[in-house]
Amino acid sequence: MSGNTLGTLFTVTTFGESHGPAIGCVIDGCPPGMALTEADVQLELDRRKPGTSRHVTQRQEPDQVEILSGVFEGVTTGAPIALLIRNTDQRSKDYGNIAETFRPGHADYTYWQKYGVRDYRGGGRSSARLTAPVVGAGAIAKKWLCERFGVEVRGYMSALGEIEIPFVDWSHVRENPFFAPNADIVPQLEDYMDALRKDGDSIGARIDVVASGVPVGWGEPLFDRLDADIAHAMMGINAVKGVEIGAGFASVAQRGSVHGDELTPDGFVGNHAGGVLGGISTGQDITVSIAIKPTSSIRTPRRSITRAGEPAVVETFGRHDPCVGIRATPIAESMLALVLIDHALRHRAQCGDVSSATPRIAARAPDAQ
């Protein structure tokens, strides 16, 4: 299995399985000299951890992080940083009924066909449990980006199933378990999830992520374009089936006179590009949306096959998120932060001394609509 590392200069390699003794990651390329404690990382992990409301999996994992290396006297040394998160609430017996079958919509079938062996307990390596170390690494990336460039990476849920969530204010996001930017809609979301759980079914979600303060110039054309790497990273999140940057698929119906963001001496007039042109950051907000599919582990009986190819019916009774999108916001934020820190370091390596006589215009003109 060779696809476990993300990044070029700032790299993250994850390890572990859902029901193994521990999960974690090794981060290489973190700049030295940044103050870092386990509390800095734990703050982000607590936003993602399971068991925080009745609407997510009831698996009770504290997700307590241990920093094993790369930090001395509270400061990063430039050496690899190893993060370890111990699994403490595995319940492998819940998965005995799927040891010989494949869950529809899950990686069970493809892992078996590719590797000839499969850890069926909680999905093993394919489990969303492996997003915890990604969030741990993302916490480090966020901290460095904020301290070095003033970059802020934030996200929110913009849709739960067919329910659109109008954006009201960022302050609402941290006040509810859905990461919804609209407190008034939370009771509707709760009722929706309660009904879904009673039905033994699941649903998808859309998550929006915004990075503010990114300087102009990050990105490596042609094939390591900033937006290409963002899409690559976002598709590496479990259950993500679609990525939009800026106007995304709505660009199909926009005319060039609308989609092209005009430039004025006072700044850009729009941001349909999502903060990226030609694979390089414009200095505007980088805006990303991801589509998350419904959880495949559900109680509703579904047709499948056994390992011998015989017909079977699959019902899953473990502790699962009826909507994995509810806890996906900090994961998507982390993925974006990991791409940004990697490109910040790559830009510094090649173009750190480049200067231009053209002024850097504001991300948004005062009269922009």
Curated annotation (Swiss-Prot):
Pathway: Metabolic intermediate biosynthesis; chorismate biosynthesis; chorismate from D-erythrose 4-phosphate and phosphoenolpyruvate: step 7/7. InterPro entries: Chorismate_synth, Chorismate_synth_AroC_sf, Chorismate_synthase_CS. One of its GO terms (cellular component) is cytosol. Its cofactor is FMNH2. It catalyses: 5-O-(1-carboxyvinyl)-3-phosphoshikimate = chorismate + phosphate. Reduced FMN (FMNH(2)). It is an enzyme of class 4 (lyase). FMN binds at R125, S126, S127, N238, A239, G278, K293, P294, T295, S296, S297, R319. Pfam families: Chorismate_synt. It comes from the Bacteria. NADP(+) binds at R48, R54. Its EC number is 4.2.3.5. One of its GO terms (molecular function) is chorismate synthase activity. This reaction introduces a second double bond into the aromatic ring system. Belongs to the chorismate synthase family. Homotetramer. HAMAP family: Chorismate_synth (MF_00300). PANTHER family: CHORISMATE SYNTHASE (PTHR21085:SF0). This is Chorismate synthase. The lineage of its organism: Bacteria, Pseudomonadati, Pseudomonadota, Betaproteobacteria, Burkholderiales.
